[in-house]
């Protein structure tokens, strides 16, 4: 990069093909915000403005040889302001951090089983951030599932850091700037030799403006959440303020949800929210001409009450160097206005970056490991991939379990339907939270057609599919047909069917009843009680085409028609009737150790030949 040789208040280094002279800079820096440096420059030659974009540049503010403050960034804007005379041209250049490109990028994607630091590294790398530093004073927890949905990568990264209690700032050198992420005041930068005093004067260590307003803050922060793995867990956490303001009980703040199912994290979220409220009312406003101040930088402030370390929360630098153009000896000036807070006050960003609200329904595809058609856990959850998640490598192994709504749910009772692999499901989000999806049902599509075609639109019901690799002819089914005059309830078991009744069963048939057993046996076992079959009108027919009929009783069997009976019991067989006729077409044989034939009124024997004895 070319650097002008001018030893003055402002100097600039850039990739411009013609030397640039910086004449004015207004630089804005704030913790957890992108810096923006507006720089007016003059070029002696022609500048290709398009070639300047996304190129590095640095402005140095030289404070009388005592210190130099660098403002490094990439060019996000470069345009002509005015033409001076016939040669020099004035341009406006804007420098921003490399992270600013994340404000342009937007995405819809899921991150599984990663810490916030892991996710941020991906975001920073995607945005072309070359230098980062994480100064974290606690180990980040692994996040099971984190969604970025229709939001810029900067928006996503900012809200992620706010949820973790983190914040960021930038450190500048002559040839680079570093994005620093931290979660503790110890992570801020100590400005070398920066000790400022309140008072009136022209030296760089004087603060010429100072204001410390007293403001009311929340008296208590309460957060609450719910853990479906442990429904009785107490996730209501409270944090009282340490500020000695009156009426704190009148200013409670409640937040739902806490965005965590972890007790320790819920405590942290309550504390971080309280610290953010306290930090916001601890700010002082100041101004002066110490050019070494930087957002996220520590300096000592000396007052009548003593010396205390403060940290710059935001600052606006204004510098102008027009001595050469104005033709005067000293046409330079520098000043700043800043906000700062005591180092004894933990800094915390408010959770102000809105989470995307997942309104309406979303659709997803059910995932399962290779060879599995039903993939679930002990809570009936499934793995899914949203259609807006463009990852081609999404599998059941790198996805998170998602709960499934059932028509009824209790402790081992209710309904249970587990969506199967490759089917499409509708997904809603608890509290519209992108990290809390829940499957609410299945959807037919161009590949997965409804059970019944349009011609059978009067039918409704359930049809399953046999697992594994069951075809269209392998299913269980329970359906209804509501076509007028042809109403039907249909039950199909692909293999076996078992019915259990703990007490009574009543079956009423108003017309015909047909039972067909194509092959196999039929068995009815009555362990205790009576069996009765009553036909009030009609006939009973029992037919065995190729076999035999056996009836067995421990006590007796009785056949009865009117007054005529045939009784078989343990003593023998008794035939009683108004008339008993035995007709043997070929032979009739009566045989026993004792045979008695008796006619009370008359005994008649007849035959072509009668042989006795």
Residue ranges and their predicted role:
Residues 80-95, 179, 319-338, 374-379, ...:
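Short, solvent-exposed secondary-structure boundary/capping segments
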Residues 1-20, 205-207, 359-365:
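Polar/acidic, low-complexity leader/linker segments enriched in S/T/G and N/D
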Residues 51-52, 292-293, 419:
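Short, well-ordered loop/turn sites that connect or cap secondary structure elements
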Residues 170, 181-182, 358-583, 588-591, ...:
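Structural signature for extended repeat/solenoid scaffolds and their inter-repeat hinge/linker regions
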Residues 65-73, 306-314, 322, 432-442:
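Short, Lys/Arg- and Gly-enriched loop/turn segments at beta-strand edges
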Residues 114-132, 138, 146-344:
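Extended, domain-scale alpha-helical bundle/helix-rich regions
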Residues 49-133, 137, 142-146, 171, ...:
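Surface-exposed cap/loop segments at beta↔alpha junctions
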